[in-house]
UniProtKB/Swiss-Prot annotation:
Compartment(s) where it occurs, according to its Swiss-Prot or TrEMBL record: Secreted
Primary subcellular site in the record, as a coarse category: secreted
Domain of life: Eukaryota
Known role: This cephalomyotropic peptide stimulates contractile activity of cockroach protodeum (hindgut).
Protein name: Leucokinin-5
Keywords: Amidation, Neuropeptide, Secreted
Cellular component terms per the entry's GO annotation: extracellular region
Residues with PTM Glycine amide: 8
Example of a GO biological process term: neuropeptide signaling pathway
Length: 8
């Protein structure tokens, strides 16, 4: 699948 994740 595809997706977007971010941690900052």
């Amino acid at each position: 699948g595809s997706g977007f994740s971010s941690w900052g």
